[in-house]
Amino acid sequence: DRLAASYAYTGLERLAGARAVFPDAPAMVASGSLIDEGMHAAVALLDQHSEITAIIAQSDLLAIGAIQAAEERGLTVPGDLSVVGFDGARVDGLTTRTLTTVVQPIAEKGRAAARLALGALADARDGELRDQLFTSILRVGDTTGPPRES
C-alpha cells in the first residue's frame, strides 16, 4: 500500500507541475508505471481529445506505451504527436526510439535519502527532516517536435 500511495503522490505532484505550465490541457494519471498502462491512458486521452499534439507521461515506461498507442492508431511520433517521459531511465530494448525525457538526479536523490535515513537513525528532530528539492534536466530525443498544423 505504501508503494502504491507513494507512486500516486508522485504522479499527482508531476501532474500539478504540468498543470502549472499547461492549466487547460487535458490530463489523466495512470494507476501505475507499466508500458500497458501508458497505452491504455494514451488511448483514452486520444479518444477524448483527438486534437492533442503532445503527451507528457509521468514515467518513461508510460511514455513508451503512449508512443505504441499512437503508432497503432497510425499517428507518427513526433510528426503528429510529441511524447515526453519522466525519469531518464534506460529503456534499451523496449523501443527503437530515443525518448525525450526529464532526467532525475538519481545520485543526488540517493545521497539525500541516505542523509535523511541516517538522521532518522540518529534520532534527528522532525525539523531536520524536510522536503528536498532537486533540479532535473530535459534530455531531448526523437519523440518531440513542433506541433502539427491544424
Annotate each PLM feature.
Residues D1-S150:
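Bacterial carbohydrate/catabolite-sensing allosteric modules
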